[in-house]
UniProtKB/Swiss-Prot annotation:
Lineage per the UniProt record: Bacteria, Pseudomonadati, Pseudomonadota, Gammaproteobacteria, Vibrionales
Name of the protein in question: Porphobilinogen deaminase
InterPro entries from the UniProt entry: HemC, Porphobilin_deaminase_cofac_BS, Porphobilin_deaminase_N, Porphobilinogen_deaminase_C, Porphobilinogen_deaminase_C_sf
Positions bearing S-(dipyrrolylmethanemethyl)cysteine: 243
Oligomer and partners: Monomer.
Pathway(s) served: Porphyrin-containing compound metabolism; protoporphyrin-IX biosynthesis; coproporphyrinogen-III from 5-aminolevulinate: step 2/4
Keyword RNA-binding part of the UniProt annotation: no
Source organism of the structure: Aliivibrio fischeri (strain ATCC 700601 / ES114) (Vibrio fischeri)
Additional facts recorded: The porphobilinogen subunits are added to the dipyrromethane group.
EC number of this enzyme: 2.5.1.61
Cofactor(s) required for function per UniProt: dipyrromethane
GO BP terms, alphabetized: protoporphyrinogen IX biosynthetic process
Family membership noted in the UniProt record: Belongs to the HMBS family.
Amino acid sequence: MSQQLPVRIATRKSPLALWQAHFVKDALQAAHPGLEVELVTMVTKGDIILDTPLAKVGGKGLFVKELEVAMLEGRADLAVHSMKDVPVEFPEGLGLVTICEREDPRDAFVSNTYNNIDELPQGAVVGTCSLRRQCQLKEARPDLIIKELRGNVGTRLQKLDDGNYDAIILACAGLIRLGLEDRIKSAIEPEQSLPAVGQGAVGIEARLDDDRLRALLEPLNHPETANRVLCERAMNNRLEGGCQVPIGSYSLIDGDQIWLRALVGEPDGSVMIRGEVSGPVSDAEALGTQLADQLLNDGAKEILERLYAEA
């Protein structure tokens, strides 16, 4: 690829996906003045299938397959993802090459009536499509009625405003990026709801043999975020985590030490397996795998085997 060719970003058409694509475009052009960057928009299966829970129709990979095909066929050079939506495995020839600085990784409590989970009345209806959020909500408040909630951020907020739910749970990062932070009644601390693996971080997937592109992307990589996300993903990879199972994790870096907390739960919140681990940042991925093995030994293995068998 010559220096003159534009960089083509494959992206979904949802407002948040377009925000992420423009974020990467702007960062590339700021780092490399004069570089041409184009957006190649496309619709994925995940954008089309809105009447079925993600866990039942193939999981998060539904949002990335078309983008990956475009890269493999040479119609696009890179794809920008919310890290929480990036599957464990990549097609041969593709991989995660850059992780950008993380936005707020917490879940957001959104309601027109109540300020937080504790204020919800008995039997309140809460909307989420995440088994991870569902199991933690049900553990804290078994009385709550959890209803499926699909669609992009604007669609979900409209369903709340139409009175279908007393509250909904979204990612803080998505609301902040779309300029909708005023809809966040309260951020849910990790102690109450562990976020998804990589939540709040933007990752860039590209062809592994594209050395020119990888060099262009180097200034966008944020080492601290990358270490945190790689630690969380190593844990998730060892658990073979996907949409079908409730897995939460959250990591922090303090100096040269990284700390990781994670959980695996029954969807109804009746059983929650939790653990944490800490060690040198240089061992981030090994620590993630270590914590996964700890969770598996503590009972997560049985939960995961049953849920995957039912999926």
